[in-house]
């Protein structure tokens, strides 16, 4: 039976996959928008959304859980001090995934993954749409 086997392996070992998603999660929380392939973006959503939910409840145990998953003190501080209050009224759905064309070398589908409710979202959204049109 194929029940509960929904994890994408992405042609990597489990340790490589874990390290890759840890790095991608840190990059997404640092820059609030990143460009990657579509399957990686969809799988990254499963990693980052629970982290933001942890950030909404600032307790010592939640900070330790977040640090255990991210391994970056600076991003844990941002998660609990900036992103947690920003998404306090939102019940899930903290990310947006936009298809972004295809990569030149191997024609892999690309995607932009970004946090919602960014302070400069209006300006960045215009730049992203111009880049997508080009």
Swiss-Prot record:
Disulfide linkages recorded for this protein, renumbered to the chain, are none
Q: Which GO terms describe its biological process?
A: translation
> Pfam family of this protein, just one?
Ribosomal_L17
Keyword annotations of the record:
Ribonucleoprotein, Ribosomal protein
Is Lipoprotein one of the keywords?
A: no
Q: Which residues form a coiled coil?
A: none
A molecular function (GO) held by this record is: structural constituent of ribosome
GO cellular component terms, alphabetically, are:
cytosolic large ribosomal subunit
Q: Which InterPro entries match?
A: Ribosomal_bL17, Ribosomal_bL17_CS, Ribosomal_bL17_sf
Q: How does it assemble?
A: Part of the 50S ribosomal subunit. Contacts protein L32.
Identify its protein family: Belongs to the bacterial ribosomal protein bL17 family.
Name it.
Large ribosomal subunit protein bL17
